[in-house]
Design a protein with these regions (language model features):
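Short, structured beta-strand segments at or near domain termini in extracellular proteins/domains
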Residues: 189-204
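Functional-site microenvironments in short loops/helix caps that host divalent-cation chemistry
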Residues: 2-180, 184, 189, 206-207, ...
Length: 217
């Protein structure tokens, strides 16, 4: 069972090392497990809802960015969001604002490059919720793991990751507007994901059609 395998044996840290398709597969498994249980009392969501990866624009909204571009590439280039970091507008960050490339992680980084003078105390992954949430109450929007979103980057087969991870050190890559284009089949111990719960529009259309006797007119 993909979902159970993905969850692993340590629920405190993010799941990593998945392709984008595997992340989407987990969302499908989670939806089914929480709304299609034979014992209706165990269902946590109704059939009107489902889980999926966030879109690129949804991720930006969760991070508090205001963007107007039509595509991820256009939104990334918007100067108004330059210098906006998960912790504020200054660089380098104060200590203990998130899990980034730091003194604790230096031996695990291929190039040994870190945020100079920064130490969050974690070599690699940190427990979810180990740092303060952002202004809307979400944890680890910046750092810990790069997060897959639904969109592709431009007219390419590359997917997009947002947020930076425990191995991110550069000022440019830590800006919240930054997008990381990667092959959707690529795996990394710093790549993870978060899920969003949405109203299932397709399911609503099906139900409406049934209510109308199956007529589309």
């Amino acid at each position: 069972k993909l979902g159970e395998v993905i969850l692993g044996d340590n629920p405190l840290v993010p799941v990593v090392g998945l392709t984008r398709a595997e992340c989407e597969g987990f969302c499908q498994w989670l939806t089914k497990s929480e709304r299609d249980n034979p014992n209706a009392d165990l269902n946590r969501i109704t059939k009107d809802y489902r889980y999926r990866l966030p879109t690129d624009l949804e991720w930006s909204k969760m991070a508090g960015l205001i963007e107007v571009g039509e595509t991820p590439a256009e939104r990334e280039s918007e100067i108004v969001n330059s210098g906006q970091f998960p912790w504020g507008e200054s660089f380098p960050p104060d200590e203990q604002v998130g899990n980034y490339a730091d003194l604790s992680a230096v031996e695990f980084l291929k190039n040994g490059r870190i945020i100079e003078g920064y130490n969050d105390g974690f070599e690699k992954l940190a427990p979810v919720g180990g740092f303060k949430p952002n202004v809307i109450g979400l944890y680890d929007i910046g750092g810990n793991v790069h997060e897959w979103v639904l969109d592709s980057y431009g007219n390419t087969e590359r997917g997009i990751l947002r947020g930076g991870g425990w191995d991110t050190f550069s000022e440019e890559h830590l800006e919240m507007r930054c997008r990381f284009p990667f092959d959707i089949e690529y795996r990394s111990e710093s790549f993870g994901f978060r899920v969003v719960l949405i109203r299932d529009v397709e399911q609503e259309v099906i139900e409406q059609s049934e209510d109308d006797g199956g007529n589309s007119n």
